[in-house]
């Protein structure tokens, strides 16, 4: 590490420090694909700075609520990717990647009429380590000493991946004081009757083939 570069096994990676995508001289970098993992630029307009500087494709690490942008969950909808159409794609969110495969199997086999999602989630950088003022009193409490309910966009994000389920799922999150563990609890009302064993058969079947 030095001279604005990281060297790994003889390969040099250049380090830069800019606020906006348009501030970077991407042409000089000879790069045509960018992974945007800032979580800050979540619209076509905010990402336009990349394309104005010769970037051809952008992969965003957070979901974007825009029907023109493909939110991809592998094993569920990656077949929808069209290189000639999708210059921006996202990896959706961690909770959506947890939820979408289950929703896909259940909806395909039993048809989901509506559902409620609860995600038990470790703290993120929107939480605070110490009590401090906040417009949401629950978020004002120390995240490592409290459990507090908050909103989640995962249920709405499912509507981007399964348009026929838009508005049919609702959900909330509970932030809990653990370092790196999460789970998602789902309750669905289904069109077709099922049993525990039949549901497990359908859920386990995709695990026996490559994603």
Predicted feature residues:
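N-terminal Rossmann-like NAD(P) cofactor-binding subdomain of oxidoreductases
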Residues: 1-140
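Alpha-helix boundary/capping residues
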Residues: 54, 162-165, 206
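Generic hydrophobic alpha-helical segments
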Residues: 41, 124, 193, 210-211
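Single conserved hydrophobic/aromatic residue that forms the stacking wall/gate
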Residues: 201-211
């Amino acid at each position: 590490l030095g001279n604005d570069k990281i060297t790994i096994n003889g390969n040099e990676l250049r380090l830069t420090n800019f606020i906006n995508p348009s501030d970077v001289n991407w042409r000089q970098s000879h790069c045509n694909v960018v992974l945007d993992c800032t979580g800050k630029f979540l619209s076509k307009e905010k990402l336009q700075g990349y394309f104005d500087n010769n970037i051809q494709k952008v992969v965003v690490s957070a979901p974007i609520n825009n029907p023109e942008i493909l939110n991809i969950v592998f094993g569920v909808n990656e077949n929808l990717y069209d290189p000639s159409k999708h210059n921006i794609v996202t990896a959706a969110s961690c909770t959506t990647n947890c939820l979408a495969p289950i929703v896909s199997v259940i909806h395909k086999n039993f048809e989901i009429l509506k559902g409620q999602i609860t995600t038990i989630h470790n703290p993120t950088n929107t939480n605070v380590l110490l009590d401090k003022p906040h417009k949401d009193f629950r978020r004002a409490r120390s995240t490592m000493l409290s459990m507090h309910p908050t909103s989640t966009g995962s249920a709405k994000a499912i509507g981007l991946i399964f348009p026929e389920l838009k508005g049919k799922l609702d959900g909330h999150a509970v932030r809990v004081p653990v370092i790196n563990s999460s789970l998602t609890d789902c309750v669905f009302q289904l069109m077709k009757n099922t049993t525990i064993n039949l549901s497990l058969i359908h859920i386990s079947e995709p695990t026996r083939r490559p994603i």
